């Protein structure tokens, strides 16, 4: 247990013996959409993968109709034609283009997981600020709010 006192306040930090996710019992501001092969992270969702999630968010922003789908396909084709440096570079560019449009309607931050003798999540990468982070961390999803 840790205690910090700064009159008139006192802060006490102690281990939580109740192993219930606060996201299940408390109200929360954002929705966490995560993808991980071993852990159930974030809020429940039905997206197959991050591409499915980003496409749905994009279409929710521009419209779930034929015009929205054409705009999505046109954006993917334009971005793909500009990047010939490998599939990962192209995929990253498409993701960034979609997120730029999504940001017109949603505030969305990346979620990173640090998996080393326990789990920690952050909206900033752990690389450079945690030991072994270059091997034990990576982006697992997003948290968003409209």
Where are the regions that the model predicts?
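Acidic interaction surfaces
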Residues: 1-146
